[in-house]
Amino acid sequence: MEVKAVYKYARISAKKMRDVAQEIQGLSVSQATDILSYTPKKGAYLLNKTLKSALANAENNAELSVDTLVVKSVMVDEGPTMRRTMPRARGSANMIRKRTSHITVILADQEG
């Protein structure tokens, strides 16, 4: 059985999140939590929050055992971009793009 958790509009670019997401794909939940808690990146903290949410969904909603769960997939998609202007010299302006992302974590039972 599969369980998922979604974190929408996370204030980090999808490109930065994908580097962290690739590290935990296919690992057990305990290994993934250990790796994320010792990774010194903002994306690791946000992904750990989403992983814990998926774990809580598995325990409470699906009534699955935590010990047998594996991270089946982690998808990081681009969310909407907030655009801001920054004044520059001679009356011009540059665009500042504040990117967001949607994080989806899917957990599944370990096979075998």
UniProtKB/Swiss-Prot annotation:
GO terms for cellular component: cytosolic large ribosomal subunit
CDD domains associated with the record: Ribosomal_L22 (cd00336)
BP GO terms, sorted: translation
Keywords attached to this entry: Ribonucleoprotein, Ribosomal protein, RNA-binding, rRNA-binding
Coiled-coil ranges from the UniProt annotation: none
Record-level Gene Ontology MF annotations: rRNA binding; structural constituent of ribosome
Summary of subunit composition and partner proteins: Part of the 50S ribosomal subunit.
HAMAP family reported in the protein's UniProt record: Ribosomal_uL22_B
Family as reported in the entry's similarity comment: Belongs to the universal ribosomal protein uL22 family.
Function: This protein binds specifically to 23S rRNA; its binding is stimulated by other ribosomal proteins, e.g. L4, L17, and L20. It is important during the early stages of 50S assembly. It makes multiple contacts with different domains of the 23S rRNA in the assembled 50S subunit and ribosome.
Annotated PANTHER family: CHLOROPLAST 50S RIBOSOMAL PROTEIN L22-RELATED, LARGE RIBOSOMAL SUBUNIT PROTEIN UL22M
Protein name stated in the entry: Large ribosomal subunit protein uL22
